[in-house]
C-alpha cells in the first residue's frame, strides 16, 4: 500500500478576509513565490512556483483548491464523505498560526491538458505561519478496484472555458506549464489513478479528444507507477528543488516492468 504526499509552500501571502456563507467558505490569496513538492515512495520532485493567485473553496461535498500562475492553472477537488457529519468541525481561516485539517475520500486533479481521478482517501492540511501558507495533500494508497469515471471524463469535454479566480496580484508570464505539471506528475506517480488526456495539449479544456478507456487496462498500482515514470522520462530530484521545470508528457499506455528505479533517469 503506497501513499503520495503533495506539499505547497507559498511565501509573501496577500489574502482576502475569509468569506463565509454557510455551508460554503472561500479564501482568495496571492503569493510572490513558492515551491511544490511531490513524493511517492523513495522518489520525489520539487518545482519552484512563480508569482501566482490561488483560491480555496469549501462546501458540503468537498474542498476545491485552484492555483493560477497566469499562464497556466491547476485545480484539486477533494471530495468529502457526504455521510460524515464531522466535516465542518473547523473553519477556513487566514489568521496567523491557524490550522485546518480536512479529510477526503476521493481526489481529482485537473490542468489545462490533463484530468486525473483517484478513488483513495486522504487528508488535506492548511496552515498559516506569518506571511506564508503551507498546504499538504496526503493520499493513502489505492482501492482494489477503479472508480467509474466515464461521466466525469465527459465533463472535461463540456468545459467551454477556463476559470480564473479573482486577481489579487499580477502573476509573472515567464513560466508556462508550471501548474499543469502537477496534474501530469500525479497521473504518473499516484497508484490507482485513472487518467484522461487530449491528443494535443490546448489552452481550453473543451478541445480535448474523447476519452479512450481501453488504453488503460486494470493492472496493479505498482505497474502503473513503474510504466508511467518510464514512459514520461521524469526528471526526479533527491531533496532539492529544480531551478527550472521540465516538461512531463502524459503516458498513453502501460506495460509491466520489474524495476522501478531503473525506469527513472536521475539528473544532476
Swiss-Prot record:
Keyword Phosphoprotein among UniProt keywords: no
InterPro entries: Herpes_UL4 (IPR004958)
Principal location listed in the UniProt entry: host cell
Family, as annotated: Belongs to the alphaherpesvirinae HHV-1 UL4 family.
Pfam families: Herpes_UL4 (PF03277)
Protein's recorded name: Nuclear protein UL4 homolog
Record has Cytoplasm as a keyword: no
Key words, A-Z: Host nucleus
Cellular location(s): Host nucleus
A single GO cellular-component term on record: host cell nucleus
